[in-house]
Structures are given as C-alpha cells and as structure tokens.
Amino acid sequence: MAQPRIGQTVVVDVPATTANIGPGFDCLGAALDLNNRFTMRRIDGDGERFELIIEGQEGSHLRGGPDNLVYRAAQRVWKAAGQEPIAIEARVRLAVPPARGLGSSATAIVAGLVGANALVGEPLSREKLLELAIDIEGHPDNVVPSLLGGLCMTAKAASQRWRVVRCEWMHSIKAVVAIPAIRLSTSEARRAMPKSVPVGDAVVNLGALTLLLQGLRTGNGDLISDGMHDRLHEPYRWRLIKGGQEVKEAALSAGAWGCAISGAGPSILALCSEERGPAVSHAMVKAWEAAGVASRAPLLNLQTAGSHWQPKDAE
C-alpha cells in the first residue's frame, strides 16, 4: 500500500443533501448542486496530528481535534485498510452551512473517507466506504447521496446488508431550499419525536412515499403534491422552526408542488417547475422575513455525480 509523501494533497468535492423529502424518513435523500470542498494534505507528524482550516462565513462554529468528523472518518479508513495513521491537514471551503438540515455532517464524513482513501491509493471499495459512512453517521439518508449522488433510497435488508436503490428524478424538477439564519441540531430534532407512531400514520406514509417517488420519476406535479406529506416526523418538528409553517404555505401559494422540512431542519425544501422557481424562492424568503428570520433560498438541481476527488496538481 502506498505511503503518501509529505505534502501530497487531494481535493474532494462533496455535495449537500436534502433528506426525508417528506415521507421518506431516514431512508430517502437527494444530492444537490451545492458543494463543500475539502483539500486534504499529508503533513509531518504522527497519526494523531490533525489540523483544520475553515474558509467561509460559518467556519467559526466548527472545531478540529479528535472529535472532528473528517478526522474520525479518516481514522476509520486507516483502520479498515490496515494502514498506519498519518498526520493530515484539512482545508474546507464551506458552502453547505452547518446545522441547517443540508447534510453538512455528511459532507465531512464522506470527505474524510474519500480523501483518506485517496491519499493511500484507494485500497477500500466504494461499497466499503458506504458502509463506514452509514456506521459513522448512524443513518443513511444523507451520507448515501452525498457519496453516490442522485436520489437514493436506502434500506437495511433482512440479511442486515444495506441496500441502495438509485431512484429517478425528472430533470425538469427544481429544488428551492430556503436556508434560514437560525440553527437546529439533529439531536434536538430527533428528541422532539415520539418513540412510536400509530400504525395508521405509518400506512399513510408508505402510500405517500409511493406517490412521491412516482411523481419524481415522471415529473408529475400532482403526484409530488399528493406524496410530499409526512406523519412520522414533521408533525413534531415544525414547532421547532420559527415561521416554518408560514414559509411552507407561502411556497405552496407561489406554485410549489410540495414542501417539506429538509432533513432535521430548519431549512425548508420546496419542489417546483423551473418556471415557478423564482416566485417560490421570493415567497419563502419574504415569509421568513415577516417572522423576523433572515434567509436565502437558492434554486438548486439534483447533483448526480456524488463525491469525487482529484490530485491537487490537477485543479
């Protein structure tokens, strides 16, 4: 196995993700064309040395050290590959804001896995990296599309093996993601949920998920509208998002087919046609403004490539 030289550098681009998309709780997620870029460099020192440099307005909220997800993921690669740990520096150009329900943690995990694997000659397969990513994150709906790209449905089979199905997303469907200047941790959002739900609610979600997937496959706005509803997590999480219900209603009134909490929130996802995108974006920002919350609402596309890396010299 190749031992990277001091100064050897790889650049890893990892997309944001929107998870759940209404009824697909903890199993459905999509990659979006908004990337964090991680530049990982072998530096002098032992395997416990890790340096983190953040570029971006929200970098002050992130910390280095042994609990950093990039570092933890890299350590898992060294262990799985039988590789002695190496000292690394990670420079992050932050475009995916943390604690907003856009998979920022997943980008760090995937970057640590892909970058560390690349630095030592890629001894681990994509399938092994996927397994490690899910194990670190604890659920698959962000890390899977972050690694693979596209719209992904992930489930653990009876064999206990993770199975991933790449689902279709009609290119005409656009995602408006309203990103507020407020934060919500995944742990807080999960604590708001009950330990169990009525069978009737689970049945409704199964039907809604079927409609949503068919709507995304065909570009049928009516199916997306009927399918983008949830009874498992959103009823308990909307109250955590200041002005969230008003933002949702504004998006629907402006022509969005459907609207949902992105991941654990507080960002809100609206699906619509390209024609209605600007109006939906404007309506969502204005609704949050009325609630006293600053926000932005970019119009995004599905990102199908997933994470990818290149040597620094090839930039």
Swiss-Prot record:
ATP binds at residues 97-107. It is found in: Cytoplasm. Pathway: Amino-acid biosynthesis; L-threonine biosynthesis; L-threonine from L-aspartate: step 4/5. One of its GO terms (molecular function) is homoserine kinase activity. Gene3D superfamilies: 3.30.230.10, GHMP kinase, C-terminal domain (3.30.70.890). It is an enzyme of class 2 (transferase). GO terms for cellular component: cytoplasm. It comes from the Bacteria. Signal peptide: none annotated. One of its GO terms (biological process) is threonine biosynthetic process. This is Homoserine kinase. It comes from Synechococcus sp. (strain CC9311). The gene is thrB.
